């Protein structure tokens, strides 16, 4: 089959069989079977995900990453390759990322067989990007300890940019993403005896108000930060003083100092609840994703490789507010660079955003990505 047939076949198979973070068992088996067909050795440091390696002629080792997990979304696309999993969908394009890396593996294997693979290559089929921090899990598991990786590259499809556009930016390209949760515990009573209770309802209103003021009064208005409240609840019955409350949301920022400010303010809010309402309040933070930092030292190589792949380069003036665990590779492993590849095609109706039930794209864009990857490999220079 030709390369367009290859990416169409594999992407649509993966699209029909999406799996949630840390549950990508069939996807992992599919990738392993593909690698087995090429006689390529691989490791599985975690229950899901695959790390493959090909030795080249040069002394450098570079890595390419694709995330393989999907989202808990009911697909609404009316296409033959629609998701067959109930309320699970590749709504973030990871089926395309995985397929791209599979084709690149095949190209590299062909080069190796011909004695023409210029450098050593590590292929990262990573689980749990959406939730679970799969990149950090792999690093902590020692998945890359035996590889002297000098640089890590990755891409993400981007339906906000037209086909043929590659969006890049040095330094921060995505925000940090940190989840927070408030837990409130008061004392229940009948509403007729409300003075006997300690209401989590009023306490939760206070928390909501104070969180909404963090961005206005404690963060620099010239910076793009998000302190988002996603879900909250208090009590169970309409005639009872609620004895419990719960609130959760996400923080998006590019600046670690700003994140520290937000966390400190939230701890103060929790303390104030006890003083004002006699309600116990605790705030917890889930391990978040740091900002994705693109190494300026790799910029020239990235731009040249994109242009040679017939992609027009757009230098984004401000970072995206997406969170992305590719950030851990640049933070802990090696200099890294992350590129957004445009997939928007109005004629075909491919216009909806990431994490939506209608996300779709033309598989031909994936071949440009593989060309970009190969150009990077052929012209890699140590930084």
UniProtKB/Swiss-Prot annotation:
SUPFAM superfamilies of this UniProt entry? Bacterial exopeptidase dimerisation domain, Zn-dependent exopeptidases
State the UniProt keywords alphabetically.
Hydrolase
Keyword Glycosyltransferase (UniProt): no
Q: Pfam families, per this entry?
A: M20_dimer (PF07687), Peptidase_M20 (PF01546)
Recall the GO molecular function terms of this protein's record. Answer: hydrolase activity
Similarity comment text for this entry: Belongs to the peptidase M20 family.
Its protein name is Uncharacterized hydrolase SAR1410
Which species is this UniProt entry from? Staphylococcus aureus (strain MRSA252)
Where is the organism placed in the taxonomic lineage, from the top?
Bacteria, Bacillati, Bacillota, Bacilli, Bacillales
């Amino acid at each position: 089959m030709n390369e367009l047939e290859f990416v169409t076949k594999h992407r649509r198979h993966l699209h029909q069989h999406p799996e949630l973070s840390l549950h990508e068992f069939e996807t992992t088996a599919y990738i392993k079977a593909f690698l087995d067909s090429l006689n390529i050795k691989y490791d599985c440091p975690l229950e899901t995900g695959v790390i493959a390696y090909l030795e080249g002629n040069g002394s450098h080792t570079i890595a390419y990453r694709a995330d393989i997990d999907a989202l808990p979304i009911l697909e609404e696309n009316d296409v033959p390759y629609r998701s067959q999993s109930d309320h699970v969908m590749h709504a973030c394009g990871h089926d395309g990322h995985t397929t791209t890396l599979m084709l690149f593996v095949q190209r590299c294997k062909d080069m190796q067989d011909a004695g023409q693979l210029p450098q050593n290559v590590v292929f990262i089929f990573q689980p749990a990007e959406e939730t679970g921090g799969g990149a950090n899990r792999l690093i902590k598991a020692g998945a890359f300890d035996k590889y002297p990786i000098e640089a890590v590259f990755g891409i993400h499809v981007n339906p906000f940019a037209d086909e043929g556009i590659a969006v890049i930016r040095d330094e921060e390209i995505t925000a940090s993403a940190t989840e927070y949760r408030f837990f409130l515990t008061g004392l229940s009573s009948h509403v007729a005896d409300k003075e006997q209770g300690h209401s989590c309802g009023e306490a939760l209103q206070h928390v909501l108000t104070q969180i909404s003021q963090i961005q206005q009064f404690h963060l620099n208005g010239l910076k793009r930060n998000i302190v988002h409240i996603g879900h909250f609840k208090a009590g169970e019955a309409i005639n009872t003083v609620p004895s419990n409350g719960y609130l959760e949301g996400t923080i998006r920022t590019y600046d670690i100092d700003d994140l520290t400010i937000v966390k400190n303010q939230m701890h103060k809010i929790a303390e104030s609840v006890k003083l004002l309402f006699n309600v116990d309040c605790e705030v917890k933070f889930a391990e978040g994703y740091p900002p994705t930092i693109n190494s300026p030292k790799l910029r020239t190589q990235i731009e040249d490789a994109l242009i040679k792949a017939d992609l027009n380069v757009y230098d984004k003036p401000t970072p995206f507010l997406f969170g992305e665990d590719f950030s851990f590779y640049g933070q802990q492993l090696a200099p890294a660079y992350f590129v957004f590849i445009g997939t928007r095609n109005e004629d075909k109706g491919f216009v909806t955003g990431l994490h939506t039930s209608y996300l779709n794209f033309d598989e031909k864009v994936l071949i440009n990505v593989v060309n970009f990857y190969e150009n990077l490999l052929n012209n890699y220079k140590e930084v």
